[in-house]
Amino acid sequence: MTSSSTSSISSTSSTDRIERSTLINAPVSRVWRALANAEEFGGWFGVALKGKSFVAGQQVQGRITIPGYEHVVFDVFIERVEPEKLFSYRWHPYAVDPAVDYSKEPTTLVEFTLKDTGKGTLLSVVESGFDKIPVARRSEAIRMNTGGWEGQMENIKKYVTTQ
């Protein structure tokens, strides 16, 4: 399959959330598998999740494999898994400084939703809850994750359409 052009939608109406969407030239079932299968997720997201699975109510951890971020542990709590509709987890946004203990901070909620458009899958991601992140690092977390989600939406699109 070939990839269709990316349709990105950005909402900056709130400092509390990041929203991104992309149209992927693949069926919902294929995009869902790339999201909900932990090993496939790791393949496009850049995290070592071999042998792991995403189950609602459970924590999942794996080492980031993106150059320059190998010291970071991807640490998420799986909130909801609604097959071919919604996948969500909580995490500490842009928690990359090994000298900082982020465990006492609130988390943000990352929600992926999928919609069949008849021409492919509209995949949307919303990360919300930034208003609860400590002020000292909130703007950097929003800035870095905004760029991160733009890249990750391209990554999943490329992964799904070339695998």
Give the predicted meaning of each segment:
Residues E19, E39-V73, L86:
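Short beta-edge strand/loop motif at the mouth of beta-sheet-based domains
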Residues V28-S29, E79-F87, T113-L122:
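A short, structured loop/turn motif at beta-sheet edges
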Residues V31-W32, F41, V60-G62, I78, ...:
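Hydrophobic pocket/interface hotspot
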